[in-house]
Curated annotation (Swiss-Prot):
Subunit structure: Part of the 30S ribosomal subunit.
Superkingdom: Archaea
Region (Disordered): 1-22
CDD domains xref list: Ribosomal_S15p_S13e (cd00353)
PROSITE patterns per record: RIBOSOMAL_S15
Gene Ontology terms, MF aspect: small ribosomal subunit rRNA binding; structural constituent of ribosome
Pfam families, alphabetized: Ribosomal_S13_N, Ribosomal_S15
Source organism (scientific name): Ignicoccus hospitalis (strain KIN4/I / DSM 18386 / JCM 14125)
Biased segments, Basic residues type: 1-16
HAMAP family cross-referenced by the UniProt entry: Ribosomal_uS15_A
Keyword Ribosomal protein (UniProt): yes
Biological process per Gene Ontology, one example term: translation
Name of the protein in its database record: Small ribosomal subunit protein uS15
GO cellular component: cytosolic small ribosomal subunit
Length: 159
């Protein structure tokens, strides 16, 4: 069952080839250094990928370095404390909760909040299974609000 994925199928295609392109001017060590540098500036993983693509001409990190971008960040000790997709869902849930505090009769937003929080719980279950979150980690709306306040600078479009 495809949950909430009926829209947004249009996107650019990933390069088919798994070998690094010959025209990329950077080697694996230089790309690792760029990733660490950009992470220390406050950029999140997806923003680092966009910057590497648009400003440095690196289409994909994995074929060149041999590891995914987040894996490199984890090895260097600059990875975000919680996965980026989970953080952004929690941020949306916090925003919708704040909206519902002002507009309690907004039933459409209440339903949207239920769907967002269901998706958060599914992601949490997955991240616990793969070991990215501790086994005792639980989603709590108040804790999510505090986490969003604390880590929002890490996942913004940069410092």
């Amino acid at each position: 069952m495809n949950k909430r994925k009926e829209k947004g199928k249009s996107h650019s295609k990933r390069p088919v080839r798994n070998t690094p392109p010959r025209w990329v001017p950077f080697g694996p060590e230089e790309i690792k250094a760029l990733i660490v540098e950009l992470s220390k500036k406050g950029y999140g993983p997806s923003m680092i990928g966009i910057i590497l693509r648009d400003q440095f001409g690196v289409p994909l990190v994995k074929p060149i370095v041999g590891k995914k971008l987040v894996k490199i960040m984890e090895e260097q000790g600059v990875a975000p404390p919680i996965p980026e997709d989970l953080f952004h869902l929690m941020k949306r849930a916090v925003r919708v909760r704040a909206h519902l505090a002002e507009h309690p009769k907004d039933k459409h937003s209440a339903r949207g909040l239920m769907e967002i929080e269901s998706k958060i719980r599914r992601l949490v279950k997955y991240y616990k299974r793969v070991g990215k979150l501790p086994p005792d980690w639980k989603y709590d709306p108040e804790r999510a609000r505090l986490l969003v306040q604390q880590y929002s600078a890490l996942f913004e479009s940069g410092a």
